[in-house]
């Protein structure tokens, strides 16, 4: 059931509700009054993000914020999973402009403040990295389709190309030019029907807050049925194209990384199995689900395709 507009919870009230549940009983028992509890809630700085909370119909248990924000791939900063937390302080997510162009009738340049005005909702999604680890994250954002509908794709548009900001003053690896870990700027792409799918999200926040720098602030893509490298971070450009974009990892190694990158336990990476994954915080591995558990929703997009060839 889709929440009503009246169900939209301002971020500060959302936080207060969670804080009340966590602190209320203990505070009342310890002090015999609610005054200390109310004082504690007032110390929480309000956020401008308002969003529809997730109904979490799958009863997914999110990883902790510390796990999801402290273990990331962001090669513009480092190949280390933990170093971007500190190194990403050079990123300036505000002000920010998104240039949307290409095969559209209504090209636009949108500020991050304008993007915050889209109806935001919380989506609790599984996230599966091609490297074999996974997590569950409560993202905040809006369907990419909402932006694309505003742009009005032409009949020539078949793909959507995404590009990370190119600014060596903010991203250390971009200073290295041809010696960088990857060619810059980072590029990803989707077929137009994939981009228009209701699960495809442009995320501006997570865990009730704006995106941390190391998680791709201020704007990133989330495609939950694909491996994580498709979910490009710090997006500066969106372009609708006639031709399939050459995404960064396919450019680097087309034998190991394809354009589609659908999560598929039946198609191994050339150097490791994709049949299982390690959930962050767990010592044991779990079976990987086809399309990361979203097979019912997205399998029809690939009807008749050879998923071992088109990986």
UniProtKB/Swiss-Prot annotation:
Keywords: Metal-binding, Molybdenum, Oxidoreductase, Periplasm, Signal. It comes from Wolinella succinogenes (strain ATCC 29543 / DSM 1740 / CCUG 13145 / JCM 31913 / LMG 7466 / NCTC 11488 / FDC 602W). This is Protein-methionine-sulfoxide reductase catalytic subunit MsrP. Belongs to the MsrP family. Binds 1 Mo-molybdopterin (Mo-MPT) cofactor per subunit. Part of the MsrPQ system that repairs oxidized periplasmic proteins containing methionine sulfoxide residues (Met-O), using respiratory chain electrons. Thus protects these proteins from oxidative-stress damage caused by reactive species of oxygen and chlorine generated by the host defense mechanisms. MsrPQ is essential for the maintenance of envelope integrity under bleach stress, rescuing a wide series of structurally unrelated periplasmic proteins from methionine oxidation. Its EC number is 1.8.5.-. PANTHER family: PROTEIN-METHIONINE-SULFOXIDE REDUCTASE (PTHR43032), PROTEIN-METHIONINE-SULFOXIDE REDUCTASE CATALYTIC SUBUNIT MSRP (PTHR43032:SF3).
